[in-house]
């Protein structure tokens, strides 16, 4: 394996568009009709279908191919408890791996919360958005001590 220098690592993460992941459209967007279908008023129809049958979220949204990579940065490999924001490059890196090796889209989510119950409540509150949740670099005792983890 090649030796990675501090300078090379910082340049890799900052060159061009900063970060390692982005969101790109999957539907046409070049005409007014496209935009009206993507947003208002056309977006109402899939919303109403999902309201009737929540499983339709997998048919009409990105949910089925979308994973949340969530961390509070309390146990980042080799770095320890560096905090939620400082762990963001790691979560973006995990997102890159999901995308290139499995074709799965990822949102990295850094939760600035060390209280186990509050952290788990935050994750549960956003869970409907995602087809999967990947908890990453979280001190194990934070999850095992929570009563909410049993739910």
Where do the model's predicted regions map?
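Metallocofactor- and cofactor-centric catalytic cores in central/energy metabolism, strongly enriched
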Residues: 2-143
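Conserved small/polar residues in nucleotide/adenosyl-binding loops
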Residues: 144-150
């Amino acid at each position: 394996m090649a030796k990675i220098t501090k300078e090379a690592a910082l340049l890799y993460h900052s060159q061009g568009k900063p970060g390692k992941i982005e969101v790109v459209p999957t539907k046409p967007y070049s005409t007014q009709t496209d935009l009206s279908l993507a947003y208002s008023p056309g977006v109402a129809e899939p919303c109403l279908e999902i309201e009737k049958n929540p499983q339709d979220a997998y048919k009409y949204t990105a949910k089925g191919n979308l994973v949340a990579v969530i961390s509070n940065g309390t146990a980042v490999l080799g770095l320890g408890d560096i905090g939620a924001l400082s762990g963001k490059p790691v979560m973006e890196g995990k997102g890159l791996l999901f995308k290139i090796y499995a074709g799965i889209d990822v949102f990295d989510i850094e939760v600035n919360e060390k209280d186990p119950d509050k952290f788990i409540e935050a994750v549960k509150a956003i869970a409907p958005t995602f087809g999967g949740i990947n908890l990453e670099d979280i001190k194990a005792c934070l999850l095992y001590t929570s009563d909410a983890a049993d739910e």
